[in-house]
């Protein structure tokens, strides 16, 4: 194509590259930062701050135990209400919480951004409860404690 009479070819302007010097290394949604903090607190408190009896109480109170659903609710405390979700915040060791946290950052952040805060919280709670009750169905009446979402 020729350009006559002093016409110039169209010039495409390329945008200047953005200055990336102020971007954070981890750009995690606030809810995910809060969940990671809760996971850390739920690990540090029984592992390092409580006595052995206190740690056992913490795990028993917030861990999922299938036996709770084989015994009438009138014969026990209210732990059966929150343990289908609270167990997912507990971890058995530093490696357990470290790898779960890394996977949560890698895969949880895009899911959270895609589906939003409310749906993410519902996804967490429903999937934790379904997993817990699946465990209970396979281990009905068992006294072992289920901890961790992995």
Can you name each region flagged by the protein language model?
Residues 35, 41-147:
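N-terminal TM1-TM2 helical hairpin plus the immediately adjacent luminal interfacial "cap"
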Residues 1-40:
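C-terminal transmembrane module of polytopic alpha-helical membrane proteins
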């Amino acid at each position: 194509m020729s350009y006559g009479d002093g016409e110039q070819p169209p010039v495409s302007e390329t945008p200047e590259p953005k200055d990336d010097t102020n971007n954070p290394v981890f750009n995690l949604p606030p809810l995910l930062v809060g969940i990671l903090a809760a996971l850390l607190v739920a690990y540090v408190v029984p592992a390092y701050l409580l006595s052995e009896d206190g740690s056992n109480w913490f795990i028993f109170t917030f861990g999922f135990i299938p036996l709770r659903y084989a015994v009438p609710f009138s014969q026990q405390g209210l732990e059966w209400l929150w343990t289908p979700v609270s167990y997912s915040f507990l971890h058995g060791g530093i490696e357990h919480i470290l790898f779960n946290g890394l996977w949560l950052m890698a895969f949880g952040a895009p899911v959270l951004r895609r589906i939003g805060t409310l749906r993410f919280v519902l996804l967490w709670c429903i999937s934790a409860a379904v997993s817990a009750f699946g465990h209970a169905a396979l281990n009905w009446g068992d006294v072992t404690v289920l901890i961790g979402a992995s």
